[in-house]
């Protein structure tokens, strides 16, 4: 956070820069979880169960439900295929991906590095805080780049912001996010 500071400009004129804090550090909507901002393995998340057995942080349930309803009102069939998962579940997924890559001939180091671009290291996934949902088209339920061409994904990419959601891992941003594109 920047507070009032006197800054000398190149022309030696004094200028005052004043900024305000954008949010409280505890603002759950702005919680960033990634490789630099890990969560504890024992984090307590208050989730609500969805009809299909998935779960999300209860604080974003209404917005998610409204987004899904509005998408369906357009004649589309969105499906939540992945949402909240515990640290333990994340660890299992990550270790399974490493195992799969080792069986493909990757070295231990390369397998771990490659796995981390596809499956988040435990403690670094927004799924572990219940704020991430993977939504697919009922007619194409694969979590692949081709998902971006489905009517559901096109609608979501155009409208998700209206409900407080974003495309978390955009195309061509792997160097910034550390994660491959996930439409």
Predicted features along the sequence, with ranges:
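Extracytoplasmic cell-surface/polysaccharide-interacting catalytic and binding patches
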Residues: 1-183
């Amino acid at each position: 956070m920047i507070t009032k500071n006197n800054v000398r400009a190149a022309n030696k004129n004094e200028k005052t820069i004043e900024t305000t804090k954008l949010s409280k550090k505890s603002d759950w909507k702005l919680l960033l979880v990634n490789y630099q901002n890990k969560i504890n393995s024992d984090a307590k998340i208050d989730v609500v169960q969805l009809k299909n057995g998935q779960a999300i942080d209860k604080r974003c349930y209404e917005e998610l439900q409204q987004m899904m309803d509005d998408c369906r009102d357009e004649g589309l069939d969105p499906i939540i295929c992945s949402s909240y998962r515990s640290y333990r579940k994340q660890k299992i997924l990550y270790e399974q991906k490493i195992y799969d890559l080792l069986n493909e001939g990757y070295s231990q180091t390369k397998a771990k590095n490659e796995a981390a671009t596809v499956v988040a290291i435990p403690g670094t996934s927004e799924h572990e805080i219940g704020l991430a949902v993977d939504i697919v088209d009922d007619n194409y339920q694969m979590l692949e780049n081709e998902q971006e061409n489905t009517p559901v994904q096109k609608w979501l990419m155009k409208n998700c912001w209206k409900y407080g959601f974003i495309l978390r891992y955009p195309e061509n941003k792997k160097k910034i996010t550390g994660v491959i594109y996930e439409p």
